[in-house]
Structure formats: structure tokens, C-alpha cells
Amino acid sequence: MAALFKPGVLTTDGKALLAKWQAGGTAPQITHAAIGSGSYTKTEDASTRTSLKAEKLRVGISSATADGDTLNLRFVFSNDNVTTGFSVTEVGVFAKDPDKGEVLYSISVSADESVADFFPAYSGNHSVSSIFVYYIKTSNAENVTILGG
């Protein structure tokens, strides 16, 4: 069975940053994504998070394309440096805030941790990669800057 994630939500910091972008004071700068194994209750409000609960891997953006006011971000996570496997239950996208530095912009958490994807440790023989595609609305943004990757 495939992992099920709740729709991504903007965090409190993400909403504040979006307001800055929309006001035209700064161009959006997406920096990276992270996956983790944090546990969330069904009613927990993930939008109040400032970080993942249990971050395990962090990667730059592999590719990005724009489709109107939607930014399609592709992240490729590899287990090459993973020594202990884990269940992927949270995904976060980070952005650069001109006043606060790097912030957790958006987060998506597992809808059902019993069917979360397992990210294995590197066996020494075979690498495993997992691709995440994340869609972000960038309404009113004239330019979007993608950092890293």
C-alpha cells in the first residue's frame, strides 16, 4: 500500500513569508526539502511547526518548473548516507525569509502512519532513492528564486 499524506499546509512562518512575497518586498526563495519520521495525531495542527519533529534527510531541489502560478518542485532523497532505516511520516519545504533566515515554509504529514513508506538504510550494495514532487502556489510573485539543488 502506498503512503498517504495529508495535503501540504503553509506554516505560520510560511504564511508570513507569503505575505512578504505578495507585497513585493522580496522574491520567493525556496532552499531545500527535508523528510522525517515524526509522529502526529490526527487532529494536530502541523501549520504551527517551525521544524520537522524528527528530520532524517535534507536535500536541495533537483528540478523546478513553473506552471502558471504553481511551482512544481522535485526532490530526490537517497539512502547513501542513511545508517538506520525509518518510516517517512513528514515532508517539509524550507524557504529563505529576509528577516528570519531559513524557515519551514510548508509541511505535509502522514495521513496514516501504518502505511508510511519505509526508507531503508544503505546496504552497501544498492542505493534507494525516493522522489517527492511538491506543488506550491506563488500567486502575485513576479519572480521565484530556487536555491541549491
PLM regions and their residue ranges:
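N-terminal assembly/attachment segments of tailed bacteriophage virion structural proteins
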Residues: M1-G148
